[in-house]
Regions:
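A short, N-terminal "cap"/entry segment at the start of jelly-roll beta-barrel domains
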Residues: 2-40, 121-134
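Structural motif
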Residues: 42, 71-73, 96, 105
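Conserved short histidine dyad/triad with adjacent acidic residue
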Residues: 44-58
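Histidine-centered catalytic micro-motifs
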Residues: 55-62, 95
Length: 134
């Protein structure tokens, strides 16, 4: 009987509150993320300080978002939509979007498909062209 050596399944498990895991990126002043890559999708756990505003941007990848903690305003396709803990949303590829955290800040889980190449390494920025607010 031949047993092939493989990675433990435990390596596929993470916790949104464990700040010591993931690929770390700074997305803007008061906005940081931890990235977890798979072959077909990517998870980004974003921490946004109170009242911080993310830059409006777009990318070709589809993006799902889940508000884990806090509240804010999602700016998407030119609309401003209030979001709170438990809300989730879809941002189709190439749609301008951003976020403004509420007075208590926010923690958001974003899921990208396919994975964003720009996020596969630590660093800063969104890795895409930033749009000027209208």
């Amino acid at each position: 009987f031949f047993m092939e050596k493989r990675m433990s399944q435990k390596n596929y498990f993470n916790n949104v509150n464990d700040e010591n895991t993931g690929i770390k990126r700074i997305l803007g002043e008061g906005i940081s993320t931890r990235i977890f890559c798979g072959d077909q999708a990517m998870v980004s756990v974003v921490t946004i300080q109170p009242n911080c505003v993310g830059q409006i941007h777009s990318h070709p990848e589809e993006q799902w978002g889940v508000m884990l903690e806090g509240s804010g305003i999602r700016i998407q396709g030119g609309e401003r939509i209030e979001i709170k803990k438990g809300d989730f949303w879809l941002t189709p590829g190439n749609v301008d979007h951003g976020i403004e955290a509420g007075e208590n800040g926010a923690k958001v889980m974003d899921i990208f498909s396919p994975p964003r190449d720009q996020y596969k390494k630590s660093g800063s920025g969104f890795g895409v062209k930033i749009r000027k607010p209208e």
